[in-house]
Amino acid sequence: MDSATGALALEDGTIFAGFGAGAAGIKVGELCFNTAITGYQEILTDPSYASQLVLFTFPHIGNVGANAEDHEESTVEAADAARGAIFREPITAPSNWRSTEDFGVWLARRGIIGLSGIDTRALTKRIREKGMPKAAICHKPDGKIDFDALVELARSWNGLDGADLADVVDQDAPFEHTEGLWQAATGHQTALANAEFHVAVIDFGVKKNILRNLASAGARATVVNGNVSAEEVLALKPDGIVFANGPGDPAATFERSGEMIKTLVASGLPILGICLGHQLLGLALGAKTKKMAQGHHGANHPVKDLATGKVEIVSMNHGFTVDPDTLPPGVEESHRSLFDGTNSGLAVKGKPIISVQHHPEASPGPQDSFYLFTRFAGLMRDYRAK
C-alpha cells in the first residue's frame, strides 16, 4: 500500500499495511483480539493488557470519544497498559454527552499507536487458528516504513512467557481507596469513612472498578503491591484479602510473590481472587497454569456456575489459565467457560475463598457477576462473627 502510514508485522513475516493514528513510533507486543462493542477506553487502560496489541473485532471505534473518568488504571505505574490498537475503520467522530476528547487525540496522549484500514476479520481468524503471535506495530506519518525491520522486531521480542509484568504495573507505595461505583445522577459515589470492612488489596495491576465495587460493597481498601510480605499485610488487620488482576505469566509472578500468597491463604482470612489473582491462588493451592492459544478477551463470554447451574455473561481478559487437571484434593472448579471448557473459578473446601478467572467488576461488560463482591462481604461478615 503506497499511501500507508502504519503497519502491523507478525513474527511469521505477514504484514498488514494501513493508516496510523494516535501516537507515532514503533512498539512490539503480543497480538490479541477483543470482541467487545464498547468500552475501548476501559480496555486499553486495563493494566492486564500490558505489552499487548489489541485488535478490536467491532469495526467502528471512537464513537463515544474519551473522557477523564473511564480509565481503569489505578496508579501512575499502571498507565503503561496496551501498546497498540487495531481497527477496521478510521476512528469515528465522538458523539456522546460524556465525551471530552477525540479518541485519536486520547491515543496520542496516552502513547498508544492506532492502526486502521486493516482486515480485522481475517486477522481475527488467523489468531483463532494459529494463536496469539508476537507482533510489531508502527505509525509513520511520513509513510517511510521499513517492513523488514518490523518483522525482525516482532521475531526478536521475548514475548509474555516467563514475563513478570505485574511488577511493572503495580504501584510503589500503599494507598487508600474509597471511591464507589459511578451513578448517572451523582457521578462516583464516595464510601463512608465508617465502612463496614477493611480489605487489603494485593495489587498486581488492579483495575479501578474492582476497588469501586469493593467500596460500594462496604469495604475500605488499602492497596499494597505484590512485593510486600504476608506479615506486612496481616499487620493492616484486614477483614479480607483481594488478589487483584494483572498482566503477564502467573508462574513468573508467583516466583516473586508465592510465599506471601501461601501464607495469606493459610491465615484463614476471607479471600477474593480475580484474573491473575485467581491464577496465583491456583498456584498457591498446588495447581498449575498454562498458556492459552488465543486467550479470552471480550465482554460477552458465558461461564457456568457449577454449584447452581446458572450461566453468567461476563468480561474476560486473560492469556493463561489454571489447568483443572492439576487441582489437588480439596480444591474444586466453581465456574467453567462455556466457550471452550477452560477453568473460570475455584472453590476450596473449608476455606472462605472466592476465586474467578473472569472479571466480576466488568468495565466494560455485563454486571452478572457483581454479586461476587456482595458474597465476599458476606464471607467477611461471617468470619468476623466467629
Curated annotation (Swiss-Prot):
A UniProt-annotated Pfam family: GATase
CDD domains: GATase1_CPSase
Record-annotated active site: C275 (nucleophile), H359, E361
GO biological process, one term: L-arginine biosynthetic process
Source organism superkingdom: Bacteria
Domain Glutamine amidotransferase type-1 per the UniProt entry, residue ranges: 198-386
Role played: Small subunit of the glutamine-dependent carbamoyl phosphate synthetase (CPSase). CPSase catalyzes the formation of carbamoyl phosphate from the ammonia moiety of glutamine, carbonate, and phosphate donated by ATP, constituting the first step of 2 biosynthetic pathways, one leading to arginine and/or urea and the other to pyrimidine nucleotides. The small subunit (glutamine amidotransferase) binds and cleaves glutamine to supply the large subunit with the substrate ammonia.
Protein name (record): Carbamoyl phosphate synthase small chain
Organism: Hyphomonas neptunium (strain ATCC 15444)
